[in-house]
Amino acid sequence: MIENLVREEIKGFKNYEVHSIPYRYKMDANETPFELPEEVIKNIQEIVKSSQVNVYPDPTAEKLKEELARYCGVVPTNIFVGNGSDEIIHLIMLAFINKGDVVAYPHPSFAMYSVYSKIAGAVEIPVRLREDYNYDVDSFIKVIEKYQPKLVFLCNPNNPTGSVIEREDIIKIIQKSNGIVVVDEAYFEFYGNTIVDVINEFENLIVLRTLSKAFGLAGLRVGYAVANENILKYLNLVKSPYNINSLSQVIALKVLRTGVLKERVNFILKERERLIKELSKIPGIKVYPSKTNFILVKFKDADYVYQGLLERGILVRDFSKVEGLEGALRITVSSCEANDYLINGLKELLL
């Protein structure tokens, strides 16, 4: 009986899967190897007390918005805070997408664009990246001209390929589009280039950011959107009243104010280049350039490598069964110890 009540879009639907696998080093989800900054840990009791968990959190996350606005060089009314950027993607769909509307996104890219498009009943147009995983801007523009998508996603840098789309090409796509263009800058801190400065020039632009990656707060689920006030008012109409819990708001605020970001990002960038250099010495594999905190690597036998790493306690992300990513594993840049262990593990398996 229940099956007859389920929406057609949900029947046969496969959600995003997160596997629980024992590991020694977790290098599969692009998380930071760093714990909370020491000054935050020292004051954790005071932080918990100040968050007043016995009352509902600030529904507008006003103090956090003010700090994020300072960080982005905008005003607080240009900021929308979500329970991870995943929630914001979902809210964009709720606010703007009717069943049958067209959503375009790069492929391969972040899986949640497709997941939430399916839930919304949208018509999906995946736009293939080039063979080298760079954006095919001409193909994107042709899709926009032909299908007039109501929503276009650009992941920059792109996950899981680590490739980027240039600023002038993003602007070209925004100008061509009559719909909303979402530029997902989840890995901005590792790249340095942004489109945030033109949010008030283009009414149809939303920039997504997160505190899960460079700031190391994946467990708190804090993402945010930067856009003009007119577009954000519709996200506020469809969001839950208390979507960011009190602890997340207070800890995120403290971490934003610590000033540890630059040092930690520099460490990841240095380790990323070291990993790329060392892995490139191993014959039979292809290491792709990256502007993120992960690298994409192709192997002749990805299953063998994945299982071999797993047996050594190293968990990486297997994309080898995804169309366009055949033979590929994605590896998070982690601590020196974890990176060394990975390099040695791959040498044992392949040399």
From Swiss-Prot:
Cofactor(s) recorded in Swiss-Prot or TrEMBL: pyridoxal 5'-phosphate
CDD domains in UniProt: AAT_like
Listed GO biological process terms: L-histidine biosynthetic process
Catalytic activity: L-histidinol phosphate + 2-oxoglutarate = 3-(imidazol-4-yl)-2-oxopropyl phosphate + L-glutamate
Root EC class: transferase
Molecular-function GO terms, alphabetical: histidinol-phosphate transaminase activity; pyridoxal phosphate binding
Modified residues (N6-(pyridoxal phosphate)lysine): 213
EC nos: 2.6.1.9
Source organism superkingdom: Bacteria
Keyword set includes Transferase: yes
Pathway: Amino-acid biosynthesis; L-histidine biosynthesis; L-histidine from 5-phospho-alpha-D-ribose 1-diphosphate: step 7/9
Annotated family: Belongs to the class-II pyridoxal-phosphate-dependent aminotransferase family. Histidinol-phosphate aminotransferase subfamily.
Subunit-level organization: Homodimer.
PANTHER family per UniProt: HISTIDINOL-PHOSPHATE AMINOTRANSFERASE (PTHR42885:SF2), HISTIDINOL-PHOSPHATE AMINOTRANSFERASE-RELATED (PTHR42885)
Record-given protein name: Histidinol-phosphate aminotransferase
Organism: Thermoanaerobacter pseudethanolicus (strain ATCC 33223 / 39E)
Gene symbol of the encoding locus: hisC
